[in-house]
């Protein structure tokens, strides 16, 4: 009987959500040993019929790459790797097993929250996140307000939390969830919002930061993609805009900014996960942020949260030239990474995007830096590849807590170095 019930609920769940499943899909960790093997992997990536999803692209020999391989192609890919002498191991045995666990935990948490408080250590739907944002505003009207900066392609509101002690101050911008499947980022942003209101007036650091600067926080930058990743396809990364002349949907919003648009590290193929879109700012989610920042006129720091890899990066990504502010940004990032590490020992790699990961054009912090916002940083949160995008909910709180120390170090520097 119990088994029949489980099967029934499983079928029901799948039916309600028409969830795409990933039964038998594996994530392989691949270690290319030379340039030749990297070339082979890039050719493999280009084979569209294999439907490979590179979670972490092959960049330099000796550096790991991660790829999700659909069940039907697992054998073929392994045979190819072996024939080329490319070392690999299985990072995730069966992706669906992790997804089922994640789903189960969300359902369990939803039941628990009905009779209790909001649990910041769980993944939530967009609706639940919006509700909690409203609660924060209602509970701390003197410190937090909600600013609507636009609507997504599917007409969901893009709501920013504004933390301010009044007056027209210079500001810090912080966003998360520009890539839909990076769930730990939206969760971390929401925890951060709660942390700011809890600690203001108690923690001298955040108190003095907010006495000098406003903070604008956008917890879900890509709401359509987020909803889609929860209801249809957990691996979804892009927006949900319609691309004319293509059956494929969506644009990679972090290749859509007006910074080296259409250059290396972005794809002109609408079916690619890193498709840059028809033109810079074609995505309303990106354009809304650009318009808001331009009209505000006094944003001094632009920080974006991604996952995963444990990196803290600054510009440039679209070119590999050294910034004028390289020394200062490098120092700030090193300091932030040290603060972050002090809590749980989590190690972050620090440097410009181009050298830390790869050349990638059309990214948000390259645009913000070129626009004149000196303190532009991108975090890639936990982990380094045990779970990748499917970070278990039990790691949300430690991730958010340590990230907060890094964020605070950056904000303190911005506070002490007005320009």
Swiss-Prot record:
Keyword vocabulary terms for this entry: Carboxypeptidase, Disulfide bond, Hydrolase, Metal-binding, Metalloprotease, Protease, Secreted, Signal, Zinc, Zymogen
Entry EC no(s): 3.4.17.15
GO BP of this protein: protein catabolic process in the vacuole; proteolysis
Occurrences of domain Peptidase M14 (ranges): 122-414
Main location: secreted
Name under which the protein is recorded: Carboxypeptidase A2
Subcellular localization, as worded in the UniProt entry: Secreted
């Amino acid at each position: 009987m119990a088994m029949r019930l489980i099967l029934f609920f499983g079928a029901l769940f799948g039916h309600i959500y028409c969830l795409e499943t990933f039964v038998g899909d594996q994530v392989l960790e691949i270690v290319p040993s030379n340039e030749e093997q990297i070339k082979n992997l890039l050719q493999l990536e280009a084979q569209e019929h294999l439907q490979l999803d590179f979670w972490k692209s092959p960049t330099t020999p000796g550096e790991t790459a991660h790829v999700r391989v659909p069940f039907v192609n697992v054998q073929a890919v392994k045979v190819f790797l072996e024939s080329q002498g490319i070392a690999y191991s299985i990072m995730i045995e069966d992706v669906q097993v992790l997804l089922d666990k994640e789903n189960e935990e969300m359902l369990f948490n939803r039941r628990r929250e009905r009779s209790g408080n909001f649990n910041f250590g769980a993944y939530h739907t967009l609706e639940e996140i919006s509700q909690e944002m409203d609660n924060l505003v209602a509970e701390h009207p003197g410190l937090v307000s909600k600013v609507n900066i636009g609507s997504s392609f599917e007409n969901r509101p893009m709501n920013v939390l504004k933390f301010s002690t009044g007056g027209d101050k210079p500001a810090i911008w912080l966003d998360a969830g520009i890539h839909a499947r990076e769930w730990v980022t939206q969760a971390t942003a929401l925890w951060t919002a709660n942390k700011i209101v809890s600690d203001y007036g108690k923690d001298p650091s955040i108190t003095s930061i907010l006495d000098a600067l406003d903070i604008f926080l956008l917890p879900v930058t890509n709401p359509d993609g987020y909803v889609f990743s929860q209801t249809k396809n957990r691996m979804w990364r892009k927006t949900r805009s319609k691309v004319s002349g293509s059956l494929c949907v969506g644009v990679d919003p972090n290749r859509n900014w007006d910074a080296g648009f259409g250059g290396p590290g972005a794809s002109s193929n609408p079916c690619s996960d890193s498709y840059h879109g028809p033109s810079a700012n074609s995505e309303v989610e990106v354009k809304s942020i650009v318009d808001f920042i331009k009209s505000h006129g006094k944003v001094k720091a632009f920080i974006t949260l991604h996952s995963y890899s444990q990196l803290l990066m600054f510009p440039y990504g679209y070119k590999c030239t050294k910034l004028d502010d390289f020394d200062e940004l490098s120092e700030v990032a090193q300091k932030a990474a040290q603060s972050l590490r002090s809590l749980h020992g989590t190690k972050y790699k620090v440097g410009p995007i181009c050298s830390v990961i790869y050349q990638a054009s059309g990214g948000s912090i390259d645009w913000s830096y070129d626009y004149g916002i000196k303190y532009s940083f991108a975090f890639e949160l936990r982990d380094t590849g045990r779970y990748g995008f499917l970070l278990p909910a039990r790691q949300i709180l430690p991730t958010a807590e340590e990230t907060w120390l890094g964020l605070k170090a950056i904000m303190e520097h911005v506070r002490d170095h007005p320009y």
